[in-house]
Amino acid sequence: MALGFRGDVADYYHRYRRGYPPEVFDALVEVFALTPDDVAVDLGCGTGQVTVPLADRVRAVVGVDPEPDMLARGRRAAAERGAVNVSWVVGTDADVPALRAALGDGAVGVVTIGQALHWMRHDDLFREVSSLVRPGGGVAVLTNGTPLWLQDSDWSRALRESLEQWLGTPAGGTCGTDEESQERYRRSLAGAGFQVAVHGVDYTDTLDVESVVGGVLSALPVDRLPSDRLAFTERIGRALEPHGPFTEHVHVTVLTGQR
């Protein structure tokens, strides 16, 4: 199931989607007692924001994504970092049974899902994953802050207004970061037999117009990208200019389900 995150969108995603703080990976190691003998699976891996740094902590990581272009950028990121223990597989959450057949039941220390669970059938996924992970292992659902256009700041409100004028529709789409979605995921994990916990990491980031625009474009399907990128950037820049600096207070949620 390709989602339209190919071509230029994959480039924007690779360049402008920030990675996760080291404390996130420290938490995964602690919660799931990960060792250099473990295998991890990163579902909906995109261009490797979780996959590549996680490779430093385990024996091998399998990055799974429906878009070959995203995987190609992830492979490039792994090569640049010297991570030779990552495999990149075209697939979706529906392919977890095939992963179980290939890797074996109880073969995986952790299955990570970084800001991608809203694309998946989470109830079915958690039930399938429960047999894939070893005792003490489990699932980690990660969010890396609220979407740029939905934050509680003057610059974010100006961005949202400009996007809504351009799109002609409300700029919604919480990407599973809202409390209602998180509560739904917690219940689903518990229903699949996992021991549920929530961890948080906070940090502050300062953006410029280029990174704001790049972040927005990384979230659009390729057929919705503006035809005139320069004009789009100038439009967003004019909307944001009175509201600088563009400071973002990021709350990373690490929702874990331990078997």
Where are these regions (language model features)?
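Conserved class I S-adenosyl-L-methionine
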Residues: 1-35
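Class I SAM-dependent methyltransferase SAM/SAH-binding core
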Residues: 39, 47-96
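Conserved beta-strand/loop positions that form the S-adenosyl-L-methionine
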Residues: 43
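A short acidic, Gly/Pro-enriched loop at the edge of an enzyme's catalytic core
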Residues: 98-110
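Short catalytic micro-motifs in class I SAM-dependent methyltransferases
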Residues: 115
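A short, conserved alpha-helix within the catalytic core of class I
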Residues: 120-129
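Conserved catalytic/acceptor-binding region of the Class I
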Residues: 130-203
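Conserved Class I S-adenosyl-L-methionine
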Residues: 183-259
